[in-house]
């Protein structure tokens, strides 16, 4: 789990 968001892991793009 972590490829449908960004490159963090399993968290949405919460820059």
From Swiss-Prot:
More info: On the 2D-gel the determined pI of this unknown protein is: 5.6, its MW is: 18.4 kDa.
Protein name: Unknown protein from spot 406 of 2D-PAGE of etiolated coleoptile
């Amino acid at each position: 789990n972590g490829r449908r968001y960004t490159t963090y892991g399993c968290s949405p793009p919460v820059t």
